[in-house]
Amino acid sequence: MNKEKKYWMNKDEITVGEPVVGPADLQTTSTEWNRRDFLKTAGFSLAAFMTACSKTPVNKAIPFLIQPEEIIPGKAYWYSSTSHACGSGCGVLVKNRDSRPIKLEGNPDHPASQGGLCPVCQASVIELYDSKRIYNPQIFRQDSTWAALDSFVLKNLNKTRKQGKKIVLLTETITSPSNKFYIKKFLKKYANASHVEYDPISYSAILDAHEVNYGTRFLPQYDFEKADMILSLDADFLGTWLSPTQFTKDYRKNRNLDSKHISKHIQVESRLSVTGAKADERIVKSPAEMLQLVKDIENTLQSNGEHGIATKIAKALKHYKGKSLVISGVNDIGIQILVNRINKSLGNIGKTVLHNNPSFQKGGSDNAVSQLLTDMESGNVGALLIAGVNPVYDLPEGESFGEYMKTIPTKISFSGKQNETAELCNVICPLPHYLESWSDDEFTSGILSMTQPTIQVLGDTRTFRKSIGGWTGYEDGERNLIRNYWKKIYTTRKKGSQSFNRWWDNLVHDGFVMIKPKSVSVGRFKKGQLEKTLAKNGLVLVAYPSLQMLDGRHAENPWLQELPDPISKLTWDNAANLSPKKAKELGVSQSDVIQVKANGKSVELPVYIQEGQSDDVVAVSLGYGRKGTERFKNLGPDWIQKKATLAEGELVGERINHLLERKENILSYSGVSVSISKTGKTADLALTQTYNTLKNPENTAPPSMKVRPFIQETTFEAYKKDPSSGAHRGHQVVTLWKDDHPYEKHHWGMAIDLGACTGCSACVISCQVENNVPVVGKDEVFRRRDMAWMRIDRYYSGEGTDVDVAFQPMLCQHCDNSPCEPVCPVLATVHSSEGLNQQIYNRCVGTRFCANNCPYKVRRFNWFDYAHDDELENMVLNPDVTVRSRGVMEKCSMCIQRIQEAKIEAKAKGIPLADGDIKLACQQSCPADAITFGDLNDPESDISKLVEDPRHYHVLEELNARPTVGYLTMVRNREDENEGGHHG
C-alpha cells in the first residue's frame, strides 16, 4: 500500500502529548459548590472506596421436588431451534441453565447460520424476560380470558360476514407452511376474507421485477460462495440485507488467501454501509445517478459504447461471466429489472442466482397495501386482523392508517408488546416469545426449520397458529397443530425413506431437515419495460435499516440500543448523516439539530458528519422513535446533575417513516427530495469513539513512516508475491534475560483476521450476554463510561467520498508483560499460570491505576451499581460469571468460565484438551470466523500456525507489553499500489 497511507478515527482526534478532556458538560466552569452537591460527591467517593468491603448477600437455592431427567443443576443443556429475531431464519442452539434460556449460539449444521449469529439474534434472548410484555389476552384494553376472547372474536367475525364487509388479515411474510395451511382454512371459512402480506422493510421491487421478467413473483436465492465477481448496488448484504449471516459465511469462503484467486467485490452506494466498508472497491453515487449507472453497465455489456466507470465494471463482470453476481438493495422496480437483465446476459441464472430453490423470507406486496388503504378509506373493511407488523409505525401513511382503523368495528392485534397499532385495537391476542413457542418455517425452499419451546410459557399467551386454527375448528395443542399438518403431507416433501416418527424426531432434535424444494414456475425471460427515473437531482433522503434496530421491532431492547453503530459509533439515537462538504455548505456542525422536510412533513434530527457519503444525500436510519422506548427515561445512574437519559414522555430517536413516499405504489427509501433548515438547537450524541485512544510514539516508527499503523493492509497481488507485504514489523526487543515466566501447561492466545472482520458487532453483543456486561444508558455513554469488554474500532483512510474503512476488534490483549499488573496496589490484576491477565473483583478498590496504565484502553470501571431491580430480567444473567459491583474494574476475561468448563470436562472423560474444544463467546458468534483462539504451547494448534503467519502482527508491539492477542494484515483485492516495505 502507499507508504503515506494513514488510518484515522475522527477528524478531531487528539495528538500525542495533547491532554485528553471530557465532554463539554463535564468540564467545570465554576468553582462554586453548594453544600448538597459536595456531600453527594463526598458520599460517592467514600462508597467507592469502601465497596470492596461489603458482604455478598446470601441467596438460598430451592431444590426440585422431582428433578427432571435432562436437568443437572449447575450444568448447561442445549435445544436446537430457529431464531425469529431478524427474519433470516438462522438455526440456533439455545443454552439453558436450570430451565431458563440464557444464551444463543448459531447452529453449525444449519445452512443459514453455519455456526454464526447476528447481533440482533444474540440480543433477542433478553426480550424473553421483558416484564413489560403483554402476558394476558385483552378485550378493550382489559385483561380477559382466552375463552371470552374467542367468543368475542367469532361473534364479531360472523357479524362482519353477514354485513358483507371485508375481513382483512394483515401480516408480515408468512414463512411457516402450517400457518399458511390454517390461514387458507380461515379464508375458506370466511369467504369475504383476504390475506395481505407486507414487509416492514420492503423488498417488493425485487419480487415485482421478477414477475415482469419471468412471469412469477418470487425472490431468488443468492450464492456468494460461487461468485468470483460481486457487484452490489446499495445492497448491505453483510449488514442487514436479507440473510447477512449466511451471506457473510459464503462470502468469506470465496476469499481464502490460500487459493490462487479470491472474489472481487465492487460496492456502489450513496451512504457508507458495513458492506461498503469491506468492499475491494467502493463507488459513491447518489440515488439520482444509480439508475443511469446500471443502464450504462447494461449498454456496455451489449458493446454499446464507452460509459466511464460503467465500462470498467462491465469488463470485470464479463471477465467472470457465469461466475459473477449482481444484486441491488434499492426498492425501485426499474433498477431491479435491469439487474435481472444483467444477470441473465452474464449467464448467472442457476449458478449464483438460484431460481430452483428460491427464498421465502420476503413476499410482501406494496401494491396490496396501497389497495388496503383505499379499501379502509372507503369504509369497506369491517374487521382487521394484524399479525407481525405495526402499520401505524411502519407505513408512510401510518397516521392515516390509524385514523382509518378507528372506523373499523373489529380490530384484532396479534402482538407480544404494546405498540402504535396494538393500542388502537379492541382485541389483543398476546404472542409468546419465539423461545417459548413452537413453529415450523421454510425461509428457503428445501430447508424446513423447527422452533421449539425452551422454557415454560411465562404468561397466558398463545401463537398466531393456535388462534387462527382454533377459530377455524382446529382445536389442538401448539405442537400437534404443526405435527398433524406435516404428518399429512410429509411424504410429498421428505427426502429418503424414514418413517414419519423418525423424520419428526430428527426435525426437533436437529432443528431442521432438508426437504424437497418447492420450486416456482419460471416462464421465459422477458426484457420488460423500465419505470421512471429513481429520483430528482438535489438533496435527497436515504432511509436505511440500522444494524441494531432493523425496522424498529427491537427498539425496546437495551442491549441493541447501547450497541454502537458500526460506522458512526452512535448509540441511543439516530441522526441526519451529512457529508463534510454538505455540512460545510449548509453551515452546520456535528450535534446541531436540523429540520428535515419532505412532502410537507418534517422531523428534527441531530447532525452527524459522515465520511464517504454522497454530497447529495441525507442518510437517516429507520427503527427509532418507537412507542415503548419511553421506558428508558430513568435508565442509568442517578447522577449529581439529575440528567435523565430521556425527557418525560420522550422516545429514543425519531421516526422518519412519514417522510417516505411511494413511486408506482412501491415504497421508496431512496431519492425523496428534502430540504434542510437550522433550528438553532444542539443535541448530545452518545458516541463511543470520540477520540483516538491508541497512539504510537513517533520515535518508534519505521524510518519511512511518521507512526507505525495499527491497521496494516496490503493487496492480494502484493500478498501473492510476498505474504509479509503490508506488515511493518517492530524492532527486535533487547532484553537482559530470557523469558521470565515459562507457561508449562497452556498459554492461551488469540488472532483476529482484519480481512475477515466485517464490523457487524455480533462479538460485542455475544460478549455482553455471556459476561453479564451492564447497560449504562445514554448519559453515561456520553461521558465515555460504556462498559463493553469488546469494542470495534473503526478507522478511515482518505478524504471526502473516497475513503477506505477498516474495523479492528479491540479487547484486553492479555499481555505477557502487562503494564496494568505492576501498578495495582492491592494485586487485583494478576497474571495466571496460563498467560491470562485476570481481574480479582473482591480485591479491587477502584484506584483505576490499571486503566490509566493500559495502552489499549480496554478496562472498564463500574462507576455505579447498575440497575438489576427487575427480577424477571435478571433471569438472563449467566450464573457462571460474577455480576460486578460499584467501584470495581472489569475487562475481558477471555471467557475463563468456558476455559475451565472445557478443562473439567476433558479431565472427567480422561482425555487431553484438544484444539477447538474451547470456543470463546466472541469467536463462536462471529459470522466471518475472524477470531481464532487456542493454546500457543500446542505447535499443531490453529493459533500457533497463525502466529507464524507472515501476516501476523501485534498492535503497539514496540511498547513491549507482549500481547497474546494478535492481528492478521487486511488484504483487499484491488489493483496493486505502491507497496511500503516492512521494517524488521
Predicted feature descriptions by range:
Residues 1-303, 428, 564, 571-577, ...:
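N-terminal export/assembly segments and adjacent metallocofactor-ligating motifs
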Residues 321-323, 328-386, 392, 547:
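Acidic catalytic cores of enzymes that act on phosphate-bearing nucleotides/polynucleotides
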Residues 379, 393-436, 581, 586:
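Hydrophobic alpha/beta core scaffold segments
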